[in-house]
């Protein structure tokens, strides 16, 4: 890890409200722990208690560069938007996989089928990734990077990256042609028409370029072999924004290496190839040997001519000069030694990090054995979990249900945040016998419907959810079922109908990942709660029960003939939390109240389904200007809400393209472009 000298920059938290409830004590405990040098801490925060706000206060007080880890892109986008709002004057960056579509290279021996790597890079996300690494290498203190598990995958060496940075100063001696050669070496492309990130144009003694991580362009004017002036301007309008005394040009790609290192690497690749060919031929694997030689020599020729080749990351070990088995460089290496790591939803994120290495290793081993890659390709990999734990200096795990691993790492000490600003208590839990469960459940659901409230019912199998849904519909209830076989767009449409009031009961198997934090949900029923195992363990039961935690009348029903250890743990923990929450409310005269969302706020969260409906209407000729219909909803949305909408719609656009429904993909693309323009107009 690099030892970066901090060059200043203080975090400045901005919020219209201050810490309330047990947030002040949680902030103090976590801050004291960081300053004391505690390596691992755990924040147990119930749903709706403001965990992100608490973490933001800790970051501001310890004033250290921070990595915030999330287990999926959508939640990462949401966290990014929230933290941008809390820290508008600081560097809040975004680092996720930059692929809109990614099919990894693979080989299926049983079918003798090779699947070539296929991908589509999202230029905007690539720019944001470059901006994140640039901010970290600038040495500034006030940097927050929100990342998915992409942070444990291989990157170029930070030392190599820094060595390639070009510093420009007004009045410095610099040959124009030499500067152009440096730009090409940094993977900038000449394009006299489209001036976009990573491209430059030349007009006499004037060179315009857009750094790979920026949206604004630089204009460098030469007078002979001297830099006469440096200006920043808008590449779209051409408007000059300011005059600069100096500028730094960062590489336009994550993987860079100077020509000398590349020559050494190519020699090492040649040597490994010779050894591997001898081994394959000794095993009489002549087809594999021929295949490997042809592919590797082609890559070497491309590196010799262009300084780059497709799949160059598979040779990263040689380019970086690492030893066999040595871990790759990754985003963590770009942080200074004393950075802070916040793991959001740690009970899901940490197991995800643990599983990345095994899947990657299995796929690449097959490629190596059959002559598609050199053995060194195995070292282009994500970090092992043990390596990740060694690299993170201080960690705060955040979860409503921390697992045994977080508790063990934290020495059993947990910082609790159980008080909600709304005064809401954890929902009450009742246990009922299995005999007569459907009639009992039906009566409770009808009680909720009479109050305009929603119900969630969880079954153990998809078949059970469909049958129960059909039974409810037969009795006149507005019911729907939800499980993994339902397509993403249809799932979003179902959630939209639930939030808009068209559905009264939602039946499903695993409703944890759907983001069903709805204030209208006042009843959660769990069938077969005593079937210990997947989705009926203590963590899952607690997460499911939390779906009723945003309504003052929230109630959870466990249908079971016995109380399992997991059920007992959840019942005892819920009662403990309710007692603490009730005592706090009585002491401070707080009356619990349900969270209230306007119709616009409800519909914002299902924007993808709304876009599908507008697309359908457009095909029928019912609509010409989709932006007019969106405008009213957008006016009520925050910047982070719109960014989350774009992330969801990007995923649906890619799915439409994969299914060759290019008309739908183009329609979604147009809406995404409109939303991105709206984001630029909104305040940070």
Curated annotation (Swiss-Prot):
Name the Gene3D superfamilies for this protein. Answer: P-loop containing nucleotide triphosphate hydrolases (3.40.50.300), UVR domain (4.10.860.10)
This protein's GO cellular component annotations are:
cytoplasm; excinuclease repair complex
Which SMART domains does this entry report, sorted A to Z?
DEXDc, HELICc
Q: Where does the chain bind ATP?
A: 45-52
- Matches recorded under InterPro entries: Helicase/UvrB_N (IPR006935), Helicase_ATP-bd (IPR014001), Helicase_C-like (IPR001650), P-loop_NTPase (IPR027417), UVR_dom (IPR001943), UVR_dom_sf (IPR036876), UvrB (IPR004807), UvrB_inter (IPR041471)
Taking every annotated instance into account, which residue ranges of this chain make up the domain Helicase C-terminal? 437-603
Superkingdom of origin: Bacteria
Where the record places motif Beta-hairpin is: 98-121
Q: Which UniProt keywords apply?
A: ATP-binding, Cytoplasm, DNA damage, DNA excision, DNA repair, Excision nuclease, Nucleotide-binding, SOS response
Per UniProt, subcellular location reads as:
Cytoplasm
Pfam families documented for this protein: Helicase_C (PF00271), ResIII (PF04851), UVR (PF02151), UvrB (PF12344), UvrB_inter (PF17757)
**Domain UVR: where?**
643-678
Q: Which residues form the Helicase ATP-binding domain?
A: 32-420
Signal peptide limits: none
- Its Gene Ontology molecular function terms? ATP binding; ATP hydrolysis activity; DNA binding; excinuclease ABC activity
Q: Which family does it belong to?
A: Belongs to the UvrB family.
Protein purpose = The UvrABC repair system catalyzes the recognition and processing of DNA lesions. A damage recognition complex composed of 2 UvrA and 2 UvrB subunits scans DNA for abnormalities. Upon binding of the UvrA(2)B(2) complex to a putative damaged site, the DNA wraps around one UvrB monomer. DNA wrap is dependent on ATP binding by UvrB and probably causes local melting of the DNA helix, facilitating insertion of UvrB beta-hairpin between the DNA strands. Then UvrB probes one DNA strand for the presence of a lesion.
Complexes and interactors? Forms a heterotetramer with UvrA during the search for lesions. Interacts with UvrC in an incision complex.
What is the recorded name of this protein?
UvrABC system protein B
The species this protein belongs to is: Chlorobaculum tepidum (strain ATCC 49652 / DSM 12025 / NBRC 103806 / TLS) (Chlorobium tepidum)
């Amino acid at each position: 890890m690099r030892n970066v000298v901090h060059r200043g920059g203080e975090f400045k938290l901005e919020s219209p409200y201050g810490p309330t409830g047990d947030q002040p004590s949680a902030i103090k405990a976590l801050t004291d722990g960081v300053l004391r040098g505690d390596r691992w801490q755990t924040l147990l925060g119930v749903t709706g208690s403001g965990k992100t706000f608490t973490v933001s206060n800790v970051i501001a007080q310890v004033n250290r560069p921070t990595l915030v880890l999330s287990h999926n892109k959508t939640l990462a986008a949401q966290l990014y938007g929230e933290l941008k709002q809390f820290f508008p004057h600081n560097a809040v960056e975004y680092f996720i996989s930059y692929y809109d579509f990614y099919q990894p290279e693979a080989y299926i021996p049983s079918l003798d089928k090779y699947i070539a790597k296929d991908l589509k890079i999202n230029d905007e996300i690539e720019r944001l990734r470059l901006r994140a690494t640039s901010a970290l290498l600038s040495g500034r203190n006030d940097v927050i990077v929100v990342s998915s598990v992409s942070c444990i995958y291989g990157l170029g060496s930070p030392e190599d990256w820094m060595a390639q940075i070009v510093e420009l100063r007004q009045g410095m001696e610099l040959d124009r042609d030499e500067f152009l050669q440096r730009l090409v070496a940094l993977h900038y492309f000449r394009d006299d028409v489209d001036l976009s990130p990573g491209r430059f144009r030349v007009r006499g003694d004037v060179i315009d370029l857009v750094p790979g991580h920026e949206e604004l362009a630089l204009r460098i004017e030469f007078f002979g072999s001297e830099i006469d002036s440096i200006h920043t301007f808008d590449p779209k309008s051409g408007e000059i924004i300011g005059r600069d005394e100096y500028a730094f040009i960062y590489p336009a790609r994550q993987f860079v290496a100077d020509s000398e290192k590349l020559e050494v690497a190519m020699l090492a690749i040649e040597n490994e190839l010779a050894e591997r060919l001898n081994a394959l031929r000794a095993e009489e694997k002549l087809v594999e040997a021929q295949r490997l030689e042809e592919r590797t020599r082609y890559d070497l020729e491309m590196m010799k001519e262009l300084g780059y080749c497709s799949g160059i990351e598979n040779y990263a070990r040689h380019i970086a000069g690492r030893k066999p088995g040595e871990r790759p460089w990754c985003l963590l290496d770009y942080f200074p030694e004393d950075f802070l790591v916040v793991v959001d939803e740690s009970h899901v994120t940490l197991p995800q990090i643990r599983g990345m290495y095994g899947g990657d290793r299995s796929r690449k081993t097959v490629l190596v054995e059959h002559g598609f890659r050199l053995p060194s390709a195995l070292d282009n990999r994500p970090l092992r979990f043990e390596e990740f734990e060694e690299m993170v200096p201080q960690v705060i795990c955040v979860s409503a249900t921390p697992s045994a691993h977080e508790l063990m790492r934290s020495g059993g000490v947990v910082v609790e945040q159980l008080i909600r600003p709304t005064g809401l208590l954890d929902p009450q839990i009742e246990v009922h016998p299995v005999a007569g469960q459907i009639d009992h459940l039906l009566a409770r659901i009808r009680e909720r419907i009479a109050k305009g409230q929603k119900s969630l019912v969880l079954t153990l199998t998809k078949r059970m959810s469909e049958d129960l849904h059909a039974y409810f519909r037969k009795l006149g209830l507005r019911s729907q079922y939800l499980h993994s076989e339902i397509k993403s767009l249809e799932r979003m449409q179902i959630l939209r109908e639930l939030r808009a009031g068209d559905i009264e009961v939602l039946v499903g198997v695993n409703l944890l990942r759907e983001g069903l934090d709805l204030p209208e949900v006042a009843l959660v029923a769990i069938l077969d709660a005593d079937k210990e195992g997947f989705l009926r363990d203590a963590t899952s039961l607690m997460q499911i029960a939390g779906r009723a935690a945003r309504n003052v009348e929230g109630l959870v029903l466990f249908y079971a003939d016995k109380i399992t250890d997991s059920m007992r743990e959840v019942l005892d923990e819920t009662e403990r939390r309710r007692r603490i929450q009730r005592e706090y409310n009585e002491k401070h005269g707080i009356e619990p109240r349900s969270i209230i969302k306007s119709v616009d706020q409800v519909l914002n969260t299902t924007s993808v389904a709304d876009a599908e409906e507008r697309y359908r209407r457009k095909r029928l000729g019912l609509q010409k200007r989709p932006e007019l219909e969106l405008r009213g909803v957008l006016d009520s949305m925050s910047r982070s809400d719109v960014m989350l909408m774009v992330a969801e719609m990007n995923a649906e656009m890619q799915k439409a393209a994969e299914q060759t429904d290019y008309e739908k993909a183009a329609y979604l693309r147009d809406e995404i472009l409109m939303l991105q323009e709206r984001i630029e107009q909104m305040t940070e």
